[in-house]
C-alpha cells in the first residue's frame, strides 16, 4: 500500500479550505483516509494564510514511509517557518 500525504479540498465555492490527510494513493482525494494532520486555508483576498498542522504527526508519517505531495511539502515549510 503506497501511502501519501495530500490535500483534500473542503469549503465553499471561491473559498477553498484544505484538509491535510494521510491516505492510500489509490483512493479518491476526498475518500477514506488514515489520519488528519491539519488544515490549510489559503486566503484569496491577500490576508495571511492560516495553517494548522501537527508537525509531530507529519514527521511520524514520513518516517513510516508516507510521501508528501509537492504542495504539501510547501505547506509543511510554511508551517515550520511560523
From Swiss-Prot:
Family: Belongs to the bacterial ribosomal protein bS16 family.
Source superkingdom: Bacteria
Transmembrane segments: none
InterPro entries: Ribosomal_bS16 (IPR000307), Ribosomal_bS16_CS (IPR020592), Ribosomal_bS16_dom_sf (IPR023803)
NCBIfam families: S16
Molecular-function GO terms, alphabetical: structural constituent of ribosome
UniProt keyword ATP-binding, yes or no: no
Keywords: Ribonucleoprotein, Ribosomal protein
GO process annotations (BP): translation
Protein's name according to its UniProt entry: Small ribosomal subunit protein bS16
GO cellular component: cytoplasm; small ribosomal subunit
The organism's taxonomic lineage, starting at the top: Bacteria, Pseudomonadati, Bdellovibrionota, Bdellovibrionia, Bdellovibrionales
Natural source organism: Bdellovibrio bacteriovorus (strain ATCC 15356 / DSM 50701 / NCIMB 9529 / HD100)
Amino acid at each position: 500500500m503506497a501511502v501519501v500525504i495530500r490535500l483534500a479540498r473542503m469549503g465553499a465555492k471561491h473559498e477553498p479550505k484544505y484538509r491535510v490527510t494521510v491516505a492510500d494513493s489509490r483512493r479518491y482525494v476526498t475518500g477514506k483516509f488514515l489520519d488528519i494532520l491539519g488544515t490549510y486555508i489559503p486566503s484569496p483576498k491577500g490576508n495571511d494564510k492560516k495553517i494548522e498542522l501537527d508537525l509531530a504527526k507529519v514527521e511520524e508519517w514520513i518516517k513510516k514511509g508516507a510521501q508528501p505531495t509537492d504542495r504539501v511539502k510547501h505547506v509543511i515549510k510554511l508551517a515550520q517557518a511560523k
